[in-house]
Swiss-Prot record:
The keyword Thylakoid does not apply. It comes from Pasteurella multocida (strain Pm70). It holds the Pfam family UPF0114. It is a multi-pass membrane protein. Residues 1-11 have a biased composition (Polar residues). It is found in: Cell membrane. This is UPF0114 protein PM1258. NCBIfam families: HI0507. HAMAP family: UPF0114.
Amino acid sequence: MEQPIQPSQHNTKQKRHKSRQRQAAPNVISQIIFASRWLQLPIYLGLIVVQGLYAYKFMKSLWELMTNLQSMDANMIMLAVLNLIDVVMIANLLVMVIVGGYEIFVSKLRTKDHPDEPEWLSHVNASVLKVKLSMSIISISSIHLLQTFVNAANMDEKTMMWQLFLHLGFLVSAVAMAYTDKILYSTSHKGH
C-alpha cells in the first residue's frame, strides 16, 4: 500500500526541482558563452589565407628582384631586400596571432612532443603574446622606417616625420605595456 506524500516532503521535492531549474539556466548560458569562442575559428582560418597571400607576395617580389638584378643599383637592391624582410616579419606576426590566439582563446593545440613545436608555445599566455606582438610591430615599423630613410631622396619630409613619430609611438606603447605587465605580475605574486 502506497503511503500518501506528506506536505513537508512535497515542499522539499518542489524546492529541489526549482533549485535544479535555477542552476540549469546559468549553466546553459555559461556553456553558450564558452562555446562562442569557436566563432573565432573562421577568423584564424582567414588569417591562414592571408598568410598564403603573403607567401605569394614574397615569391613574386623575390622573382622580380632576381630578374631585374642587373638593372638595379645598390639602393634599389636594398629596398627590395627590405621589402622581402618586411613580408617575412608580417608573416611571422600572422603566425604568432594565429597560433597564439587560437591557443589562448579557442582551444589547446595538440602539439605535445612535436619536434617542430615553437619554444614559446609551451608557455604562451595573453601577456607573452602581447609582448611578442608589440616587438614584431616595432620590428616591422623599423623596417618601414629604414626603407623610408634609404629612399629619403624620393620621400616627402612630412611623411618621414610622421613615420618616425608613429615608430616612436609604438616604442612608447611597448614600454608602457611591459611596465604595466611588470606591475600586474609583481602585484599578483606579492603574497606568494
